[in-house]
Regions:
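Conserved glycine-rich acetyl-CoA-binding loop
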Residues: 30-41
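Terminal substrate-recognition subdomain of acyl/acetyltransferases
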Residues: 51-172
Length: 172
């Protein structure tokens, strides 16, 4: 795309409690007509790195979001938490706590809503949808308690199974 920077991400691959994890600490995509393609490319790179590091394992992907648009980045994952109509069980809430601690925002984290009330924007997934009208109302409702002006974020995580990771992370 004309040799210019259109997006950047800082992420880590690590094991949290023995489980392979991709932590998307910071991702930003320039507001342009190609932003969907840029987001897809950044996520493909994250999945490729995960595939190389954890080829036969299910992987957790976690990030912080300030707006519902960012959920687009996670659309390939299964069992995304939080999600509307689903009450998170103990292990799902535990993952939220682990991620909050790893992102160093656990002091202001609410494990029931997965919301960091303030001071949570030291890094987050910054993406503005090219089709905001297509974002489902149930996704938007997850962000009702997120006060971006105070630095609030929603901690979101989901899984990619080993067989899905092979497809998501391949460079075909």
């Amino acid at each position: 795309m004309d040799g210019k920077l259109h997006g950047v991400t800082f992420s880590t691959l690590e094991r949290i409690g023995g489980t392979p994890c991709v932590l998307l600490g910071l991702m930003t995509v320039k507001r342009s007509s190609k932003r969907d393609q840029v987001l897809k490319g950044l996520m493909a790179e994250a999945y490729h790195r995960a595939l190389m590091a954890f080829p036969d394992e299910d992987v957790v992907v976690g990030t912080r979001l300030v707006a519902p648009d960012g959920m687009e980045a996670l659309k390939s994952l299964t069992e995304i938490i939080p999600r509307t109509g689903h009450r998170a069980v103990g292990e799902e809430r535990a993952w939220g706590r682990r991620l909050a601690k790893r992102f160093a925002v656990d002091a202001n984290y609410d494990e029931q809503s997965f919301v960091v009330k303030s001071a949570g924007q030291s890094g987050f997934l910054d993406y503005e949808s090219s089709k905001p009208e297509k974002i489902k109302p149930e996704i938007v409702s997850l962000f009702n308690d997120v006060n971006a002006k105070k630095g609030g974020v929603l901690i979101v995580h989901g899984w990619t199974m080993a067989e899905s990771l092979v497809k998501l992370g391949s460079r075909a």
